[in-house]
Amino acid sequence: VMFRQVAILGTGLMGGSLAAALRARLPGVRLVGFGREPDISRAMELGLFDARADSVADALAGADLVVLAAPISVNCALVPEVAAHLPPDAVLTDLSSVKGPVVTAWRRTIAAMSDGAATQATPGLGDFVPCHPIAGSDRGGPDAADLDLFVSREVVLSPLPGNRPDSVERLQALWQQLGAHVTRMSVADHDRVFALVSHAPHAVAFAVAGAVAADGANPGRPDAAGKDAGAGKAVRDDGEEAPIRAGDHAGPGLLDLTRIAGSSPELWADILLQNQMPTLRAIDAVDARMQAIRHALLTGNRQALTRLLQEGADWRRTWQRHG
């Protein structure tokens, strides 16, 4: 049985896109939005929701699917209040890009509600099925909502021990009706994998963009050999001199590499901190590669350098063909 009423807590890009997709593909579903201003008012102006709620309790009343669609720290903070008002037969899910902290918040909450028995199947409490749609944008807010955001995208479900089988199946069917491909993996595997394929790459993109931004602050500084690295002035075709800043000469390659550095720093600080240890291990793996490349450069070892570059190129070309 498909869901009849969906409460979406968080009305920015992800929550708004989910509402738009549900509106377009499952028009019989009633959509209730709960979020901060000005997002919720703008979402209502855009017709993304049938109704707005002024409290979590109001949002959850009558819902058979509840979606945590706010930033991850907000989702974690909402869990106790959501659990207190979640209808017994409802399914709770989230759109967080890190699973561990939300699952921990849920388990602590249900343990407190059931006198310390940290069991998933607590009588009278709805069913939490963690979820992560692998989709997004460097834009935010309800104006960025895209009804096709999830089409042909992967959605990862991380079922918990004790989940009702029909909860997982209904949620999977919902995402498939929105055009997504569904994969299941454990919470721990999810956070390890996405630390390497998403979280560490975002950190790298921000770092490269920051290094480019810092260039030109000290024109004419010595290079590693103590020689002048340049006068720090460029002559344009109109004869005017201008300070040399590397970023002024960036081409498509740098723009491709740093595109995701246009995302919200506040959002990504939250994600990186919430997935701290897996992301640190992923950054260490990237750093080990960079150090190997650096050593090959330092020693002039063309064979080693080519091999390191080839390993990356092989994966990229294979992924581009089949990914």
Locations of the language-model features?
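Residues at the starts of beta-strands that form the adenosine-phosphate
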Residues: 5, 28-30, 127, 154, ...
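NAD(P)+-binding Rossmann beta1-loop-alpha1 motif at the extreme N-terminus of oxidoreductases
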Residues: 1-61
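Internal alpha-helical scaffold of NAD(P)-dependent oxidoreductase catalytic cores
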Residues: 149-228, 232-260
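Interdomain hinge/lid region at the active-site interface
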Residues: 243-312
